[in-house]
């Protein structure tokens, strides 16, 4: 089994011990020779030469230790750089994980959109059918009032003032209705007329129109017949349309 090589520190300590022993022997020998006045220069010279040799080896080992110290400092700098790079790699790995998650989500959404597109293509509706459907909506006055609509007309646009007062919102808000409290008598609704407090107060409305107003479920033709084709009613219609436009602009 190979003996492990000693470290530089152990070798330095060993040289220091040898130098200490040789120095002590040399000093003791010099002191003894001075007290006994014996001259034996041969042994002293051997110890001195051995001491000089050990000192030279010690100096060489010190140079090795200094070079190893520089290498150790460089290693510490490199270790710090490695730690920094490792932190950067971990951060980059985290960002890559987030990007992978985002891409996976985007791919999934893209696949779902492609499925929706394929489904839409399989069940596509022609433009002619859409135009026909739009024409039906427009013809039934579902999005706008009829061209002959005037204030007091029970047709669209909904809701009318009568419906607002008799509805749930009118009951909750407790709007002042001149003693009616938002409710209409059942016989008045059944007869298709308004109470006196809710009768139209505009000068351009005829008494026949206020007394013969029909609920929304009656036909519109009967109401137009009640207006009559005479000249006075035509003038009233013009005034009514003017007031309607002005009232709509004020409400906007």
UniProtKB/Swiss-Prot annotation:
Q: Is-annotated flag, keyword Transcription?
A: yes
Q: Which GO terms describe its biological process?
A: regulation of transcription by RNA polymerase II
Which GO MF term does the entry hold, naming one?
Answer: transcription coregulator activity
Q: Which InterPro entries match?
A: Mediator_Med4 (IPR019258)
Q: List where this protein forms a coiled coil.
A: 70-112
Task: Tell me if Methyltransferase is a UniProt keyword of this record.
Answer: no
Ranges of Low complexity composition bias in the record: 241-252
Cellular component (GO) terms are: mediator complex
Q: Where is the protein found, in the record's own terms?
A: Nucleus
Per the record, which residues fall in region Disordered? 218-252
Alphabetized UniProt keyword annotations:
Activator, Coiled coil, Nucleus, Transcription, Transcription regulation
What protein family does this chain belong to? Belongs to the Mediator complex subunit 4 family.
* Subunit: Component of the Mediator complex.
This molecule's function is given as:
Component of the Mediator complex, a coactivator involved in the regulated transcription of nearly all RNA polymerase II-dependent genes. Mediator functions as a bridge to convey information from gene-specific regulatory proteins to the basal RNA polymerase II transcription machinery. Mediator is recruited to promoters by direct interactions with regulatory proteins and serves as a scaffold for the assembly of a functional preinitiation complex with RNA polymerase II and the general transcription factors.
Put simply, this protein is called Mediator of RNA polymerase II transcription subunit 4
**Originating organism:** Xenopus tropicalis
């Amino acid at each position: 089994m190979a003996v492990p090589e000693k470290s530089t520190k152990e070798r330095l300590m060993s040289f220091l011990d040898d130098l200490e022993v040789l120095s002590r022997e040399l000093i003791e020998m010099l002191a003894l020779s001075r007290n006994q006045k014996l001259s034996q220069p041969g042994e002293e010279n051997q110890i001195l030469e051995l001491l000089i040799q050990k000192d030279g080896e010690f100096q060489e080992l010190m140079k090795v230790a200094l070079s190893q110290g520089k290498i150790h400092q460089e290693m510490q700098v490199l270790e710090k750089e490695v730690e920094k790079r490792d932190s950067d790699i971990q951060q980059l790995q985290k960002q890559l994980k987030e990007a992978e998650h985002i891409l996976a989500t985007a791919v999934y959404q893209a696949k779902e959109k492609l499925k929706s597109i394929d489904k839409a293509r399989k069940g596509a509706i022609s433009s002619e059918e859409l135009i026909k459907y739009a024409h039906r909506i427009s013809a039934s006055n579902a999005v706008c009032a009829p061209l002959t609509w005037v204030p007091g007309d029970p047709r669209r646009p909904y809701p009318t003032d009568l419906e607002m007062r008799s509805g749930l919102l009118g009951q909750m808000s407790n709007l002042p209705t001149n003693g009616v409290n938002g409710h209409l008598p059942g016989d008045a609704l059944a007869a298709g007329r308004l109470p006196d407090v809710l009768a139209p107060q505009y000068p351009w409305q005829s008494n026949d129109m206020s007394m013969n107003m029909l609920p929304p479920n009656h036909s519109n033709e009967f109401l137009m017949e009640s207006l009559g084709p005479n000249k006075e009613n035509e003038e009233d219609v013009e005034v009514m349309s003017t007031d309607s436009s002005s009232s709509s602009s004020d409400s906007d």
